[in-house]
C-alpha cells in the first residue's frame, strides 16, 4: 500500500530534509508541497539537490490560510506541518477537523501545560484540549502512544539530544534531580534557512558562543519528559552554544550520583531504556569512547554515552544527533511510520551516516 502525504511549509531546511528522506521511502508518495515564496515552482527551486529526484510536475502550492487547507492539500493520509511557531498553531485544529493525521514540527503542541506556553513562548495557548490530545513525538520513549495518535508533536532538536542523554539516569534516580545541568553545542542549520545575525553561518564560523543562557525554551521539553518518568517537577540548568558546524546537536549533561555505581551499572541502565531501539547507539570504548556528531551526520541515528567521574561523584551524560534528521525530519518520518502502521525504520534504515 502506498500512503500519500503533504508537506505544508516545505521550502525550509526541515522541509527539504523531509523531501530527501521521503524520496527513498518505499511506501510513501509526496502528493502536495506548499510554499508562499516558491508558489508554482518545482521543488528544486528551493532545494537544488533534489533536481531530478522529484518530477518537475511536483510544484509548490500557495497556502495562505488554515481555511484553505483541505482545498489546497486534498485527499492525503497524513500532513507534515513544517511551519514556524505560532503559525502552525491554527493549522493543526483545521487539519484534524478535515481528518488528516498530523505530524507538527513546530513547538506549538509539544508542552502539556497551558501555562508553560505563556512562560516559554509568550502567548496564551488557545487550544488546551488539543494539548491534551497531542502525543510528544520521541518514538524511543513514547512509541506505543504514537502508534494510535492523530496528532504528534515533533520534539525540538536540542530537546531530543538532551532527553536521550539524561532520561535513563534521571528515570532511575541515580542522579540528583535537583542538580542537572545541560550544555548543548548546535550547528547553524538550527537557525533555519532565513539568515539573521547570530544565526547566519558566516557569523558563527570559527567561533563558539552561548545564547539563551538564562533558559532556552527546549529545556521545557526535557523537564516535561523527566516529570513524566519520575512523577515530580524538576528545574534543569540549560545553555546552548552556537558553534561553527552546520549540522549537529551535541548534548553534554552533568549531575551528581545518588548512589555508588560502577560504569557497568550505568551502561546497563542505558541499555534498559534503549535496547531494541533501532536508532540509538550506546557508545563505549575504542575507537571513539564518546558520542560524536560526525558519526550520525545525515542520518536518523543518535549516539548516546556517558563518563563516570568517580573522583567527584559526577556523571557526565552525552548524546549526539543530526539536528535536521533525528532532531527534526528523521524523527518526523519515524513518527509517520508508526502512525500509519509501518515499521518505524522504513525509509530511514538505509540512510547511513555520512563521513567524513
UniProtKB/Swiss-Prot annotation:
List the active site: 157
EC no. given is: 1.2.1.103, 1.2.1.106
Task: Identify the keywords attached in UniProt to this record, alphabetized.
Answer: Amino-acid biosynthesis, Arginine biosynthesis, Cytoplasm, Lysine biosynthesis, NADP, Oxidoreductase
Q: Which SMART domains match?
A: Semialdhyde_dh
What's the catalysed reaction?
[amino-group carrier protein]-C-terminal-N-(1-carboxy-5-oxopentan-1-yl)-L-glutamine + phosphate + NADP(+) = [amino-group carrier protein]-C-terminal-N-(1-carboxy-5-phosphooxy-5-oxopentan-1-yl)-L-glutamine + NADPH + H(+); [amino-group carrier protein]-C-terminal-gamma-(L-glutamyl-5-semialdehyde)-L-glutamate + phosphate + NADP(+) = [amino-group carrier protein]-C-terminal-gamma-(5-phospho-L-glutamyl)-L-glutamate + NADPH + H(+)
BP-aspect Gene Ontology terms: arginine biosynthetic process via ornithine; L-arginine biosynthetic process; lysine biosynthetic process via aminoadipic acid
Chief place of localization? cytoplasm
Looking up NCBIfam families in the UniProt record yields:
argC (TIGR01850)
Name of the featured protein:
Putative [LysW]-L-2-aminoadipate/[LysW]-L-glutamate phosphate reductase
Organism of this sequence? Ignicoccus hospitalis (strain KIN4/I / DSM 18386 / JCM 14125)
Protein's gene: lysY
Amino acid at each position: 500500500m502506498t500512503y500519500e502525504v503533504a508537506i505544508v511549509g516545505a521550502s525550509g531546511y526541515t522541509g527539504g530534509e523531509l523531501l530527501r528522506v521521503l524520496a527513498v521511502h518505499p511506501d510513501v508518495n509526496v502528493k502536495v508541497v506548499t510554499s508562499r515564496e516558491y508558489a508554482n515552482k518545482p521543488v528544486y527551486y528551493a532545494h537544488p539537490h533534489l533536481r531530478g529526484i522529484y518530477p518537475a510536475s511536483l510544484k509548490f502550492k500557495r497556502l495562505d490560510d488554515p481555511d484553505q487547507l483541505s482545498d489546497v492539500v486534498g485527499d492525503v493520509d497524513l500532513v507534515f506541518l513544517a511551519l514556524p511557531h505560532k503559525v502552525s498553531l491554527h493549522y493543526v485544529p483545521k487539519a484534524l477537523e478535515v481528518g488528516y493525521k498530523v505530524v507538527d514540527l513546530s513547538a506549538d503542541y509539544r508542552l502539556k501545560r497551558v501555562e508553560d506556553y505563556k512562560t516559554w513562548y509568550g502567548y496564551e495557548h488557545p487550544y488546551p484540549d488539543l494539548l491534551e490530545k497531542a502525543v510528544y513525538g520521541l518514538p524511543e520513549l513514547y512509541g506505543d502512544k504514537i502508534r494510535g495518535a492523530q496528532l504528534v508533536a515533533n520534539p525540538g532538536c536540542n530537546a531530543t539530544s538532551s532527553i536521550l542523554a539524561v532520561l535513563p539516569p534521571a528515570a532511575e534516580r541515580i542522579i540528583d534531580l535537583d542538580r542537572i545541568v545541560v550544555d548543548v553545542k548546535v550547528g547553524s542549520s538550527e537557525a533555519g534557512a532565513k539568515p539573521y545575525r547570530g544565526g547566519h553561518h558566516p557569523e558563527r564560523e570559527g567561533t563558539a558562543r552561548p545564547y539563551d543562557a538564562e533558559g532556552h525554551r527546549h529545556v521545557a521539553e526535557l523537564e516535561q519528559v523527566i516529570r513524566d518518568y519520575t512523577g515530580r517537577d524538576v528545574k534543569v540548568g540549560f545553555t546552548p552554544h552556537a558553534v561553527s558546524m552546520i549540522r549537529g546537536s551535541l548534548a553534554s549533561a552533568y549531575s551528581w550520583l545518588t548512589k555508588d555505581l560502577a560504569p557497568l551499572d550505568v551502561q546497563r541502565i542505558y541499555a534498559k531504556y534503549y535496547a531494541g531501539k533501532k536508532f540509538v547507539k550506546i557508545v563505549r570504548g575504542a575507537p571513539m569512547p564518546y558520542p560524536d556528531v560526525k558519526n550520525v551526520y545525515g542520518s536518523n541515528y543518535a549516539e548516546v554515552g556517558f563518563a563516570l567521574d568517580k573522583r567527584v561523584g559526577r556523571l557526565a551524560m552525552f548524546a549526539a544527533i543530526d539536528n535536521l534528521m533525528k532532531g527534526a525530519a528523521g524523527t518526523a518520518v519515524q513518527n509517520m511510520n508508526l502512525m500509519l502502521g509501518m515499521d518505524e525504520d522504513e525509509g530511514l534504515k538505509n540512510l547511513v551516516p555520512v563521513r567524513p
